Structure formats: structure tokens, C-alpha cells
């Protein structure tokens, strides 16, 4: 009896210390982000306009709608104005909530007003505080996932350490707080933690129910927070499908997870204003195909030749049904969603060539290119990449070993002990190996996906070096005889992470402290002057035209209407962006005037940084991409060069001579910006 009490006490103490460490890690990371953000932007010493300028591009748009919700007389009125928004983009009414996934802003505005925070904290601090808090939950979820897989909270501590040290590659929170991924990925991390626990073979009934409920809630929330979430869940379903093939024992559990996806898609479709993108998504087609195939599956003796044939037929059936269902859905469901994404992928993988400005501009973005050598060097210097590769190889080979044993009809143990050394037989390990390979393969093509992949690299590497099972699997292969393998595995699972942790502390902790001590300065006086002039001098009904990134800042800082936005999920907005960018091309004053007046623009803003851009890669500057699209620059051999008799508009308009002064009158300028009033009555001067 006393022994049982001791065991229960030890287990409780282990869980308590682990939970305390997980929560503390998340809280410390959130506080670190807050302190670093203050040091970088000096928020507490700045005026509201100067704070808002720190939100760049699409981040400015998201935060501007949060401000609009707080200004609305009621929540219902605020939602209505966002869903029928005609005060942002000229000549266009948009459902901003659906198109931009503004559910985070709706929730943040409700919480701000419902909690009475208006008297305590400014709206901007409340907003970024929620995001930093979610990042703390993100880190806590990664901690728990690694802990569940390895059995020791030491793995969670190492996961957090690697995550923070490699934060340049794990998160974009430092550069752009309101991004959808910063709101969504913490819920995805919670979902993966719950899924990991749910897939474990030794979980009790209450644990399964808790994990299932947490998985359901986090899957749905993740889907609501980010418009691209269903693509990430699609990769997850592929991983679960392959797990179902390789691990017969988990078939029923995997089928229950499929129901979560169907429920989340159905609820998301209704609450996202009947979003057609969810109906035509590959996620829905694949899950529906898997559930249909499950209904048609025959019960035969496991390990028999017939069972193997049925597995192959089932795989082929699922693939065929998925493609068929997706084609049928696209035939009957009207949609325009993400057509530009397919075109981009065609060009990215060399399946098509284009001179289109938007496609080439996207290809030139650093986040959409292949990873650089610096990326791999950073991961190697922090010791993350070498240990990840080691852990992945051992788990992958062990998984293959288990698969071949199944193919040969050999029975597997119901309970796996440490002495067996078969880490690849655990269903949660099989899932994570497949998932990380899929994510890693995509991240090798598109660098921006590293922010999804690297956090799980941290988690998997930390789990591996802290897992006695992984070391035991390696020793089984090496047939170690000199030292007792179980004892050595237990020692290494404690010693290796301790040595890694101490080396990381010695090398990187002083750097983190130095970053918090250093006062950085982000100040853009030219943009502040421009926004101040607009608010004081421009008519309230004025419409501004310029680069999409600048238009986002104008919408946030002034509230004035603009002609375009830095959003890339709408074909009309993409076309607008391309047309407005023509102010940096070799087009006539009359052409530019017609383009701008077609969007009812009253003012044009020319940015000196774009007009005189000296980019590191020739052909990736905005003016080069425009010249290629307009045929004024040779892109490939055999292209026909079209000579333009006009100079570059952004240069010519500054000189103030006819015909440019007939159409445009300069009303304001500073070192970075030139503002021109678009004349309604054209006066021709000689």
C-alpha cells in the first residue's frame, strides 16, 4: 500500500513539475516578447500615429479594422460595417470579415470592451498583449507535445530553448504582430499536442476524451483564424492516412479524427458566410474519400495476402475518390478562391512561364524562394539541425523496420517496452515522422513555410535526444554488448540534453540578454509627416493611390479611402495593384491618368524608394518587373523588345513640365514621398 502511494506521489510530482515548467516557459516567452518589442519600438514613449506606423503592409489593414470595431456604436453595427465595407477600397464593397479572416479582431474588440479594459489599458497594448499571450500558449503546447512523446519534461525545456534561440526561423512575431499565422498557429500547436496524446496506445478513457475535445475545439478555431489553415490540415490528414495504413491498431482512432475535420469544415462553412473555399478545398475531398473508403472496407484477417492487396486497393481508391470529388465540387460550387495560387505554383515549379507582373513579383519575394545557405548555417550553429537529422533518421528507419515486419506477416507486441528498442512502432511517432517530412519537403521549396516546420523540428529533436527509447533503438541496431544498453540509454537521455542545454545557455543566453538591454530605434519621420499632412489637408472624401503597402498604412493612420490594399487572395485587388504600380513604369501621363481616374483616385503618392530602387537582384525590382510585363525589357532569349517613347513616369512627373503638369499638380513632398493632386479639369500648357 505504501509503495503504491509512493508511486502515485512520484507521478503526481512529475506531472505537477512538468505542468509548472510548461506554463512558466510560456509566460516567460510572452514577457520576453513584450520586453523586446518595447525596446525595439519604444511604444511607451511614442504618440499613437508613430505606434501605428510600426504596423506594415497587411498588418496595418488588420489592425485598422480592430480600431474600426472599437469606434463602432455597437458590436452588431461594427460587424455589419465590416461585412458590407465600402469605405476602404474605392468603387468596391467587400466582406472584410470573410476575405481577410478578421475573426481575431472581432474577438479582441469584444474582449476589450467586455472586460472594461478601456479605463486600464490602451487598445494597441491590449491587442499586442493578446498576440503575445497566444505565443506563450504556442510555446507551452510545443513543450507538452515533446513531453508526451519522450515522457520527460526535460524535452519540453529543450524544445523551448531551441525555439527561442532560433526564433528568426520559428516565428515572424517580431516583424509583423497582426499576421494571421500569429493568431492561428498557437491553436494548431494545441491541436497537435492533443492529437499526440490521443494517438498514444496507453492512454486511458478520460485522457482520450479530454484530448478529443481539445482537438475538436482547437481544429475549428485554427480553421476560423487563418484562411490557409485547410491546406495545413490537408497535410495532416495525409499523415494520418499513411499512419492508418501502417498502424492497424489506430484505425478506429484515426476515423474519429476524420469526423472532427468534417464537423469543423461544416461549421466553418456556415460561420464564414458560406465560404466556397472550404467546399472546394482538397481537405474536404480527401476526408470525404477516406470516410467513404472506410465504409467500403472489408474485414479480413490481418497480415494475410488478401489484406495486403486490400490495403493497396484502398490506397488507390482514396486517391481516385479524392481527385474525383474535388473535380465535382469545383464544377458545381461557384468559386474564385486561390486561382492565383495555382498559377504561382505552376510558375514556381517550372510548369509554365509568364511575364505577368503579379506572378513574377511573388516569385521575387524572399519568403517564397528556396531557403538560403544562411538558414541551414543558423540551424547548425544552434545544434538543432544535426540532432534533428539524427533523430529523424533513427525514427524513420525504425518505422520502415516495423512496416516490413507487418508486410512479412510478423505479429507485433501489444505493449512496447524500453528493452524492445522499437520507437518506430509507436503510432504518435509514425505520425510526427510523416508530418515533419511533408512539411520539411515544402519548406525546402518555399522558405516562408519554415515558420510552420521549424517549431516542430525543435520539438522532434528535443523529444529524440531525451527519449531512452530512441537511444535503445540505436543500441539494438549496433548490438551494444560492453555496457548494459538500457542503463546507457537512460544515462544518455539525461546527459545529452543536459550538455546541449548548458552549451546553449553559455553561448546564446548572453545574446538574448544583450538584445533586451540594447535600445533600438524605429523612427520614420517622412511617413509621420505624410500622414499628418493627409489628416490636416486632404478632404475627408479623398481617395489615395500608391503602392499597396503604403495604402495599408494610410488606411490605418488616417482612415481615408484608398485604391488598393496589400492583400493577395483577391483577383480584383491583384489587378488593381498591378495597374496602380504602373506609376513606376514607362507609360505616358495620359495612360496613368486614365488608370487612376478609373478608380476615382484624387491623390497620387510616388515613393522615392521604389522609383529609385537599387535592388540586389536585377529583374526583381518593381520597375524591372513592370518593364518585363510591358515588353520594355528582354526577359528571355527570343523575346521581342518594345521600345517606349516615354520616360519612367515617376521620374518625369517630378520635373513639372507638360503634359505631366496638365494632369497632376504637386501639393506636398518630402525626402521620401511626392503627393500629386489628380486634376479633374485638364489644363493644357505649352
From Swiss-Prot:
Keyword Ribosomal protein among UniProt keywords: no
One GO location term (cellular component):
nuclear inner membrane
Signal peptide positions on this chain:
none
Entry's Gene Ontology molecular function annotations? mannosyltransferase activity
Q: Which domain of life is it from?
A: Eukaryota
Alphabetic keyword roster: Acetylation, Glycosyltransferase, Membrane, Transferase, Transmembrane, Transmembrane helix
Q: What is its EC number?
A: 2.4.1.-
Q: Does the entry feature the keyword Chaperone, yes or no?
A: no
Spans through the membrane: 15-35, 124-141, 147-165, 210-226, 232-248, 255-273, 279-300, 312-333, 384-404, 429-449, 452-472, 485-505
Q: Which family does it belong to?
A: Belongs to the dpy-19 family.
The protein depicted here goes by the name: Probable C-mannosyltransferase DPY19L4
Taxonomic source organism: Pongo abelii
Amino acid at each position: 500500500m505504501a509503495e503504491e502511494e509512493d508511486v502515485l506521489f512520484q507521478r503526481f510530482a512529475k506531472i505537477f513539475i512538468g505542468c509548472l515548467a510548461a506554463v512558466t516557459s510560456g509566460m516567460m516567452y510572452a514577457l520576453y516578447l513584450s520586453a523586446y518589442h518595447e525596446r525595439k519600438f519604444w511604444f511607451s514613449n511614442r504618440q499613437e500615429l508613430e505606434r501605428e506606423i510600426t504596423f506594415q503592409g497587411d498588418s496595418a489593414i488588420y489592425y485598422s479594422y480592430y480600431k474600426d470595431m472599437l469606434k463602432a456604436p455597437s458590436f452588431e453595427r461594427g460587424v455589419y460595417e465590416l461585412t458590407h465595407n465600402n469605405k476602404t477600397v474605392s468603387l468596391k464593397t467587400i466582406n472584410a470579415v470573410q476575405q481577410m479572416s478578421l475573426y481575431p479582431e472581432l474577438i479582441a474588440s469584444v474582449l476589450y470592451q467586455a472586460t472594461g479594459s478601456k479605463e486600464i489599458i490602451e487598445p494597441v497594448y491590449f491587442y499586442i498583449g493578446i498576440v503575445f499571450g497566444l505565443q506563450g500558449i504556442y510555446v507551452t503546447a510545443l513543450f507538452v507535445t515533446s513531453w508526451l512523446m519522450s515522457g520527460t519534461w526535460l524535452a519540453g525545456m529543450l524544445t523551448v530553448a531551441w525555439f527561442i534561440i532560433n526564433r528568426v526561423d520559428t516565428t515572424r512575431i517580431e516583424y509583423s504582430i497582426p499576421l494571421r499565422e500569429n493568431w492561428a498557429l498557437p491553436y494548431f500547436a494545441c491541436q497537435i499536442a492533443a492529437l499526440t496524446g490521443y494517438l498514444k496506445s496507453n492512454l486511458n478513457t478520460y485522457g482520450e476524451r479530454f484530448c478529443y475535445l481539445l482537438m475538436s475545439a482547437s481544429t475549428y478555431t485554427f480553421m476560423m483564424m487563418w484562411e490557409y489553415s485547410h491546406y495545413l490540415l490537408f497535410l495532416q490528414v495525409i499523415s494520418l492516412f499513411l499512419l492508418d495504413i501502417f498502424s492497424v491498431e489506430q484505425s478506429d482512432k484515426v476515423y474519429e479524427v476524420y469526423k472532427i475535420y468534417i464537423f469543423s469544415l461544416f461549421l466553418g462553412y456556415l460561420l464564414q458566410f458560406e465560404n466556397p473555399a472550404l467546399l472546394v478545398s482538397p481537405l474536404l475531398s480527401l476526408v470525404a474519400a477516406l470516410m467513404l473508403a472506410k465504409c467500403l472496407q472489408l474485414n479480413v484477417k490481418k497480415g494475410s495476402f488478401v489484406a495486403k492487396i486490400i490495403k493497396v486497393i484502398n490506397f488507390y481508391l482514396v486517391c481516385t475518390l479524392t481527385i474525383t470529388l474535388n473535380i465535382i465540387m469545383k464544377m458545381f460550387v461557384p468559386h474564385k478562391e486561390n486561382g492565383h495560387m495555382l498559377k504561382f505554383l505552376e510558375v514556381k515549379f517550372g510548369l509554365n512561364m509568364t511575364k505577368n507582373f503579379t506572378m513574377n513579383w511573388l516569385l521575387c519575394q524572399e519568403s517564397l524562394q528556396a531557403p538560403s545557405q544562411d538558414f541551414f548555417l543558423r540551424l547548425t550553429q544552434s545544434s538543432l539541425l544535426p540532432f534533428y537529422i539524427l533523430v529523424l533518421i533513427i525514427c524513420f528507419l525504425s518505422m520502415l523496420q516495423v512496416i516490413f515486419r507487418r508486410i512479412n506477416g510478423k505479429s507485433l507486441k501489444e505493449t512496447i517496452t524500453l528493452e524492445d528498442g522499437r520507437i518506430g512502432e509507436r503510432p504518435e511517432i509514425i505520425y510526427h515522422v510523416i508530418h515533419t517530412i511533408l512539411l520539411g519537403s515544402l519548406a525546402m521549396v518555399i522558405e516562408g513555410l519554415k515558420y510552420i516546420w521549424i517549431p516542430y523540428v525543435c520539438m522532434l529533436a528535443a523529444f529524440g535526444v531525451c527519449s531512452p527509447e530512441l537511444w535503445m533503438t540505436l543500441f539494438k541496431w549496433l548490438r551494444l554488448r560492453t555496457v548494459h544498453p538500457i542503463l546507457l540509454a537512460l544515462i544518455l537521455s539525461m546527459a545529452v540534453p543536459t550538455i546541449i542545454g548548458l552549451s546553449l545557455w553559455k553561448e546564446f543566453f548572453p545574446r538574448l540578454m544583450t538584445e533586451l538591454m540594447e535600445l533600438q530605434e524605429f523612427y520614420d519621420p517622412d511617413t509621420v509627416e505624410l500622414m499628418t499632412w493627409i489628416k490636416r489637408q486632404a478632404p475627408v472624401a479623398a481617395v489615395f493611390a500608391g503602392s499597396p503597402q503604403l495604402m495599408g498604412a494610410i488606411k490605418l493612420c488616417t482612415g481615408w479611402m484608398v485604391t488598393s490594399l496589400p492583400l493577395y487572395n483577391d483577383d480584383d485587388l491583384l489587378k488593381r495593384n498591378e495597374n496602380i504600380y504602373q506609376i513606376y513604369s514607362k507609360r505616358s501621363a495620359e495612360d496613368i491618368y486614365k488608370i487612376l481616374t478609373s478608380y476615382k483616385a484624387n491623390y497620387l503618392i510616388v515613393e522615392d524608394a521604389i522609383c529609385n530602387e537599387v535592388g540586389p537582384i536585377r529583374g526583381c525590382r518593381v520597375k524591372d518587373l513592370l518593364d518585363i510585363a510591358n515588353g520594355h525589357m528582354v526577359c528571355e532569349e527570343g523575346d521581342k523588345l518594345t521600345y517606349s517613347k516615354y520616360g519612367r513616369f515617376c521620374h518625369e512627373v517630378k520635373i513639372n513640365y507638360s503634359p505631366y503638369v496638365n494632369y497632376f499638380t504637386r501639393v506636398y513632398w518630402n525626402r521620401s514621398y511626392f503627393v500629386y493632386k489628380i486634376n479633374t479639369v485638364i489644363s493644357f500648357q505649352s
